[in-house]
UniProtKB/Swiss-Prot annotation:
GO terms for cellular component: cytoplasm; cytosol; nucleoplasm. GO terms for molecular function: ATP binding; calcium/calmodulin-dependent protein kinase activity; calmodulin binding; protein serine kinase activity. The gene is CAMKK1. This is Calcium/calmodulin-dependent protein kinase kinase 1. CDD domains: STKc_CaMKK1 (cd14200).
Length: 505
């Protein structure tokens, strides 16, 4: 593409696009020449730079994708590490194979300029060539996006700000850390759009091997859309529930280790997910599970989120979340319960509590004991862990730190997981980062995308072929494995949504 525009074909709007693209090129180049930010407390290596041509402008330098070997440094390979070496397969999360979340990963792209071109079968937004639609939903659509300079595909989500703001922000959260509220003073009241930008600023800085990565956000202040670019995980959900072929106990153990580390990282960042389930656990090309979909998540102050409303997927809800007591409940304990249901699904291919009717399902969750089928047979240690995770009393339910030490998880101590200090560092967001959490698109340019990307309103799993979606019934009888809390349309397992209360300190 050297010497020519990065467009699919020539268009009558090309001259206007070129003129807009040429604005502030000098400022743009100066902005690109700034110091490289650190990632998760680790200084990045020098970046290789690759030219990407923007219509009507000089070549703009974009970061080249780092090699995989630069990002997969095992915690146990550190000289100071104390973990035992172990032989493990490509999906192992044991000592010899776990990828360090603190190893450098490429920073979130900051787009200082946007150029759009349109053709009958192609739309290009900056360096992204938008391809097939891979998901549709109540809040927007998901398109496959190809970055030519990196030769890499991403998932671009186009979200409706009107629908987001109708639900008072996505995900809803209290004021940022360090505010007066955190110091015992009066809480700062945030406008809905401010909440959106603050949460985007947090999500952009989350950097963990077991959490889906947000790459870039673009915003058109005069139009209804936010454009979010995420890592594309082609393998999709780790499991569809129900299924006839559940995982072996060993495979379930390896996947659970990934989920627990990702969950501990989120809790360290003071985020409760609130919708852990197999369809929100996506499998990366490296064989590791990554937590996705923060549509009903909450961020909290203090040690834990104190919640008072129900959200998430009925079959994965904890007893206290569906209680009529009116009392607040622990956000962390909710995540542990949902992870326990997920672990049960891993080994049995179905949820522990199933019913066609929501009230009957709630009654079973609150009152009935966990039943272990005769087939497949599982170990007593695994049964012990499941029962502790599905303890109906949140006060006595096992926590993430104790799950990490459980004999079934560690193979009786032979394969310990890294400590919180080794794989978590707290993300802090400054006011400047919140202000710059999105890049603005000139309003006239997005008319093309509005017409080409917002044609349909209902959607399913963005990583699932359409034919398969039509053939497969919903995940559970009565659609009780489908997320609650959305008044308009369905929701993809990986599309952000917005239906939550405020988390109390």
């Amino acid at each position: 593409m050297e010497g020519g525009p990065a467009v699919c074909c020539q268009d009558p709007r090309a001259e206007l696009v070129e003129r807009v693209a040429a604005i502030d090129v000098t400022h743009l180049e100066e902005a690109d020449g700034g110091p490289e930010p650190t990632r998760n407390g680790v200084d990045p290596p020098p970046r290789a730079r690759a030219a990407s041509v923007i219509p009507g402008s000089t070549s703009r330098l974009l970061p080249a994708r780092p090699s995989l070997s630069a990002r997969k440094l095992s915690l146990q390979e550190r000289p100071a590490g104390s973990y035992l070496e172990a032989q493990a397969g490509p999906y192992a999360t044991g000592p010899a194979s776990h990828i360090s979340p603190r190893a450098w990963r490429r920073p979130t792209i900051e787009s200082h300029h946007v150029a759009i071109s349109d053709a009958e079968d192609c739309v290009q937004l900056n360096q992204y060539k938008l391809q097939s639609e891979i998901g549709k939903g109540a809040y927007g659509v998901v398109r496959l996006a190809y970055n030519e300079s990196e030769d890499r595909h991403y998932a671009m989500k186009v979200l409706s700000k009107k629908k987001l703001l109708k639900q008072y922000g996505f995900p809803r959260r209290p004021p940022p850390r360090g505010s007066q509220a955190a110091q015992g003073g009066p809480a700062k009241q945030l406008l809905p759009l401010e909440r959106v930008y603050q949460e985007i600023a947090i999500l952009k800085k989350l950097d963990h091997v077991n959490v889906v990565k947000l790459i870039e956000v673009l915003d058109d202040p005069a139009e209804d859309n936010l454009y979010l670019v995420f890592d594309l995980l082609r393998k999709g959900p780790v499991m569809e529930v129900p299924c006839d072929k559940p995982f072996s106990e060993e495979q379930a153990r390896l996947y659970l280790r990934d989920v627990i580390l990702g969950l501990e990282y989120l809790h360290c960042q003071k985020i409760v997910h609130r919708d852990i389930k197999p369809s929100n656990l996506l499998l990366g090309d490296d064989g590791h599970v990554k937590i996705a979909d923060f549509g009903v998540s909450n961020q909290f102050e203090g040690n834990d989120a104190q919640l008072s409303s129900t959200a998430g997927t009925p079959a994965f809800m904890a007893p206290e979340a569906i209680s009529d007591s009116g009392q607040s409940f622990s956000g962390k304990a909710l995540d542990v319960w949902a992870t326990g249901v997920t672990l049960y699904c891993f080994v049995y291919g179905k949820c522990p509590f199933i019913d066609d009717f929501i009230l009957a399902l709630h009654r079973k969750i609150k009152n009935e004991p966990v039943v272990f089928p005769e087939e497949p047979e599982i170990s007593e240690e695994l049964k012990d862990l499941i029962l502790k995770m599905l303890d109906k009393n949140p006060e006595t339910r096992i926590g993430v730190p104790d799950i990490k030490l459980h004999p079934w998880v560690t193979k009786n101590g032979e394969e310990p997981l890294p400590s919180e200090e080794e794989h978590c560092s707290v993300v802090e967001v400054t006011e400047e980062e919140v202000k710059n959490s999105v890049r603005l698109i000139p309003s006239w340019t997005t008319v093309i995308l509005v017409k080409s990307m917002l044609r349909k309103r209902s959607f399913g799993n963005p990583f699932e072929p359409q034919a398969r979606r039509e053939e497969r019934s919903m995940s559970a009888p009565g659609n009780l494995l489908v997320k609650e809390g959305f008044g308009e349309g369905g929701k993809s397992p990986e599309l952000p949504g917005v239906q939550e209360d405020e988390a109390a300190s």
